[in-house]
Amino acid sequence: MNKIIHIILISIISLTVISCAKKSDSSSTTSSGLFVAVGYSGTLLTSSDGTSWTSRTSGSSENLWNSYYGNSTFVTVGNKGTILTSSDGITWTSRTSGTTEHLYGITYENSTFVVVGDNSSGSGTILTSADGITWTSRTSASSNSLWDVNYGNNTFVLSDGAGGIQSSSDGISWTSRVGIDTYGIWGGAYGNSKFVVASTYGYIFTSSDGTSWNNVISRSASALNDVVYENSTFVAVGVNGTIQTSSDGTSWTLKNTGVTTQFNGITYGNSIWVIVGVSGNIHTSDGETLTSRTSGTTVPLNRVIYKE
């Protein structure tokens, strides 16, 4: 099952109520870090400050869904088994994944990259790699399409398109856990000693161990596409400009963004929040003001990450 397009991600801002402003860049902070945003039609953008963005050649025309930095390597995944790697985020190389399934989620911990994806073959796709170059297929404990994967408390946790959860200590052998929703879970994060995941119908669940889960929000106003834990704050983003924040993952505050666009992904770095979404939209925030940035593209952007 193909991943539902842009259910708008979860994230941004952790402090005060956000106001919306559109302005040109007047100043930026020099940083050795790098933001990488990925999207449709092989789109790859980079920025050192989150405000000025440069298009990079991915070598792929497939939709790119997610990216992660680990083991001194950027790894980006996408449709039809696409896996791209880069040492600097600028120059990218296509790798052989061994699958033609669409790949949606990726993480890196315990010296292991874990990638998850579609299920047209009858089982959700799980791939692992030590270096991002050579990949091995693993057996999923579910036939559902797999959407996201995270790591915390010595445990990998993945979520699927039917509200299912699986966990693993090594990323290789997986155990199915009780389904926590009937809707797809598109985004998740680990922080403050707990996992937090959000569904396409706006439900938010938490767990300390990846096995037992609590429903902390029955349903928010909008579908949520992404959740991160950065700057000591959980942030979830989604459709209709939705941004929700929480310090503990349990009590959430809906921010007034003044924006109606769909947000798909969010990250924090260089003392700034960066949010990406449909139509090439990129917004940044210092925690108080949400500012529209020029991306140079009109295609949907799915995720954004920051490497220090």
Regions found by a protein language model. Give the residues of each.
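Bacterial Sec-dependent N-terminal signal peptides
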Residues: 2-4, 13-34
